Amino acid sequence: MNPNIQHINTKIAKYKKDVVNHPLYNQLNSIEDVQKLMEIHVYAVWDFMSLLKGLQIELTSTSIPWKPIGDNKIRRLINSIVLEEESDVDSDGNPAPHYEMYLDAMKECGANTTEIEKFVDSVADINLPKVNTAIDSFLATTFDVLKTGEAHKIASAFTFGREDLIPDMFTAIVNLSLIHISEPTRRYS
């Protein structure tokens, strides 16, 4: 591994551990608790897609007329992540973005998707509608990074703040939820 990446991983290890072992996960004792978590976390799912699109804009060609820009390997990596995030295959074999799959999962467990759907519908450029103080602050931090247009900052937020962290975080949530929650989820149809 690149020594610079190792250095960053060492520096952020404590913070990653804090997120993965957050006491909030132990408080997921009912399906209602999971619904509430999802109703808040969905903004991070949307935010993740915004970071990814920021990387795509900075490191690949998204302009008309098209021109090849940047490193071929980086373009391929970014575009393959975009393909996976925007056009993955759901459990029924249909193409669907991860964001929309998350909304479907929210609906399946009875979580409210109205607020995030209104939020996304009303987003214009990078002027974000207000949600609540915590979500607004989280999104403002991301969009401050995106506004810099600096690929290394966007890539750092994407990689170390999302892509590298999310699998461990979800594993912790799922494991604790399986222990604490015995109610079946409702099937959205």
Question: PLM ranges: what are they?
Answer:
Residues 1-5, 11, 21, 117-122, ...:
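Sequence termini and other peripheral, non-core segments
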Residues 4-19, 29-65, 84-89, 145, ...:
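Alpha-helical bundle segments that constitute or directly flank the non-heme di-iron/ferroxidase center
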Residues 58-66, 113-120:
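Short, charge- and proline-biased low-complexity linear segments
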Residues 70-76:
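Short, well-ordered alpha-helical segments
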Residues 76-178:
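Active-site-proximal alpha-helical scaffolds that flank and shape metal-associated catalytic sites
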Residues 179-189:
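Single conserved hydrophobic/aromatic residue that forms the stacking wall/gate
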